[in-house]
Every structure is written in C-alpha cells, then in structure tokens.
Amino acid sequence: MPLLRRLITDHPHSELLVTTTTPTGSRLLIERLGNKIKHQYLPVDIPFFLNYFLNKWNPKILILLETEIWPNLINICKRRSIFTALVNARLSEKSKDNYLKYNSLIKPAIENIDLILAQFESDKRRFLEIADRKDINTCGNLKFDQDIPSELEDISKTIKQDWSTDGELRPILIAASTHETEEDEVLKAFKKILISSPNALLILVPRHLERFDRVKKIIQASGLALVSRSKKEDVKKNTQVLLGDTIGELNFLYSLSDVAFVGGSLIDHGGQNLLEPAAQGLALMSGPSLRNFSDISDQLIEKEGLAVIRSAEELSEKFIELVENPDVLKKSGEAAFEVFMTNRGALEKIINYLQEPLQA
C-alpha cells in the first residue's frame, strides 16, 4: 500500500492498473484506494490469456511484488519491451529449493526481469543461486514504511477503557493470522491464562476469511464466551473471546491489544507478517516456523521484542509473565517498535530506482 499511494501521488496523470488474484485482495484494494486505481484479476500464466490482457491494457511498466514470479508474463513483457521490475523481492530457502527443481523455467524468467530490488542480502543471495545476476540491489522491506493512523491510539484507548472491568484495564492477547490447528492451541493456552487472569480477553483473527465460520464453531465448542466483530456485537464484562471475522481491520485490532501472537508459525508454514504489531509497539510471540520472515524475526529476537514459543503451555506462560511484569511488557514492545523504526526507508530507495523507467 505505501508504494501504491506514492505512485498515485507522484504520477497523478498516469493510469495505475493493480491486479490481484483473490476476492479478498480485490475488496481491500477497492476499499482503501477506490477510484484512484483501476483493478483487474491477474490472468492465469498462459500466453493466450496474457496476450489478450496486455493488448487490452498496453502497460508501459510492470511492477511485481515480493514473490510474484510469473514466467510467461515476464517473458512476454520482455518480448514486448515492457519494463519489468520485481520490488520488495523476498525468497525463502524453501522457495529457492522449489524453484531450483524447475530451474529451466524460473531462471530465464529471473534473467528477463529488468530490475530486481530484494529486501535483504539473504534474499539477494538466494536469487543469485538461481540466476547469476550482478545487478540485484537491496532496499529493505516496504512493510516497514507503513503508517499507523495518528487517531488510532486515541480511539483504542477509549475502547479499552470501555472494556475495563471494575475500573481495571483487561489484559488483551491478540492471536492474528492463525491457520488451521493453531486456534486449538491458542484456545488451550487462553484457558490457562484465565486461571491467573480471569478478566483477560482474547482477540482471535484467522488468516483466511473462508475459515471464519469454522473458527467460530471451534470457539463455541470450547465453552468460552464469544462475540463476533462482523456482527458488531459489544464486548461485555463476561466476554472472553472477540472473533475478528472482518477484512481490513487487523491494524485496528492490534491497537486494542497488549501482546500479539502471530500465526502461521506453530505449523510448518513459515510465519506471517510481524511488522504490523511491531509498528504499534506490541510485545510479540510466534511459533518457531519463521522462514518467510527470517531477517525480520532474527532482529526482533535479538532485541528481545519477539519470544518464540512452541506450545500452548509456553504461550500461556509467556503472556502471564508479560502482563504481570509491566516493565518487561513495555520493554519488549519498545524493542519491537525500535526494530520497526530502524528499518524504515525502503520506499524512498524503491522510488529512486523506479524514477527512470517511470519517466521513460
């Protein structure tokens, strides 16, 4: 989003076409940017459909993000002399190994990309193991350049005060971007938390919207008192779980929380975005599967802004330790925020690299 907003500002007379591959992505894009952009679903990576798509839109430049390597799209753009850039590029060890299995397909695609801007040196190194290019640069991670609305802090303070019990603020754990089976572990941990902190509140936000109903049933089966964000149900004194079954509200829900557990990490998925809660100064917890964000997680662990947990028991113990020791909680959140702030600046670097092709 930071890159899109900057392109809109810097090139007000250019037409910006943004593609997505899912209805969720489409909905978020339209909600946040509306008529400032045009939206289309990206065609499948088959030449017939791609040529039709490119004939219709006739783009001057193609900007791909992170891991979006579409061999046919890239190769066709090369033949059409459409400048192609892969920005905020990342490549985990697992993805690199998978790409090497199809090197005859992936290597030419990477070689045909005009500009590659990797997030970190480790990403650059993995790209070089696939294709020997001397012109790959690193810019950091664009997600560090996200801005948190200034009014969010005041709004969240008011809501947390409304949720207080007997004048005491409730300790709030958010479990965000959870995947299948992780909710079971989180709920197990939260029941242990309630023994020592009976007024604690859990905000549970599944990663995929198609699982919202399933997760709601899991919470109901656990016997915990539940309200649903999508139904605009109020959090009352006896509420134990708020289900975040809406789209585009994760930053808002983070702002209401004290500690964040970020999912996709207790299972072998590689983790999810740690930067959104770090940007709000939350103490962080994650499972051990962090390969998708290894550079960021390594920094957070080193600064003691992220605790790696491996079970429901460890999750409950760490949360209790943090909320019962306000100084430790504050220090951990500040450490996470420091990592976030010191890594900002990728947006300006990327814009500088894109200036020439955008003005050509």
Question: What are the roles of these predicted feature ranges?
Answer:
Residues 1-153, 157-158, 178-180, 193-198, ...:
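Active-site and donor-binding regions of nucleotide-sugar-utilizing enzymes
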Residues 1-12, 154-231:
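Conserved catalytic-core segment of nucleotide-activated headgroup transferases in glycan assembly
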Residues 33-39, 216-244:
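Nucleotide-activated donor-binding/catalytic signature segment of Leloir-type glycosyltransferases, i.e.
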Residues 49-56, 233-240, 248-258, 279:
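Short acidic alpha-helix that forms the nucleotide-activated donor recognition element
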Residues 60-61, 172, 259:
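Structural motif
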Residues 82-84, 226, 284:
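Hydrophobic beta-strand scaffold residues
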Residues 113, 250, 255-339:
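Catalytic binding pocket for nucleotide-activated donors in carbohydrate/polymer assembly enzymes
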Residues 343-360:
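C-terminal alpha-helical cap of glycosyltransferases
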